[in-house]
């Protein structure tokens, strides 16, 4: 069985969502289905069909989260020997060599990635280029727009 890396924070968020789905969302949907059934003919009952569709999405998400958590390898970055290298969970500040544009990313699991808040997937091309590198190393990342050269100016290990 393949295990997928995940930060402790990412696992906690998934557990919280799972609890919400099981204790709040699922019972609300079951109640909505019961109420819709009371309205009679189910063939043309839009409320019933909408509630059943919600139930399908909810149950699918529950199964998805449970599978992710059961296959997750929770990595606590504070317990890893890093020797100053970029590793999973590291917060890395890089600067574009050409433009001097500076950006900070945290390398996280696939399910935690959110580029809007600078969380990049460990399997992304940028993260793959950063893993194993150290402070002041330069990397070249091939993008659809061409190759971009970056220099690592900071590596932090923040939980």
Swiss-Prot record:
The keyword Disulfide bond does not apply. GO terms for biological process: DNA-templated transcription elongation; regulation of DNA-templated transcription elongation. It comes from the Bacteria. The keyword DNA-binding applies. Keywords: DNA-binding, Transcription, Transcription regulation. Pfam families: GreA_GreB, GreA_GreB_N. PROSITE patterns: GREAB_1, GREAB_2. GO terms for molecular function: DNA binding; RNA polymerase binding. PANTHER family: TRANSCRIPTION ELONGATION FACTOR GREA. Necessary for efficient RNA polymerase transcription elongation past template-encoded arresting sites. The arresting sites in DNA have the property of trapping a certain fraction of elongating RNA polymerases that pass through, resulting in locked ternary complexes. Cleavage of the nascent transcript by cleavage factors such as GreA or GreB allows the resumption of elongation from the new 3'terminus. GreA releases sequences of 2 to 3 nucleotides. Belongs to the GreA/GreB family. This is Transcription elongation factor GreA. It comes from Psychromonas ingrahamii (strain DSM 17664 / CCUG 51855 / 37).
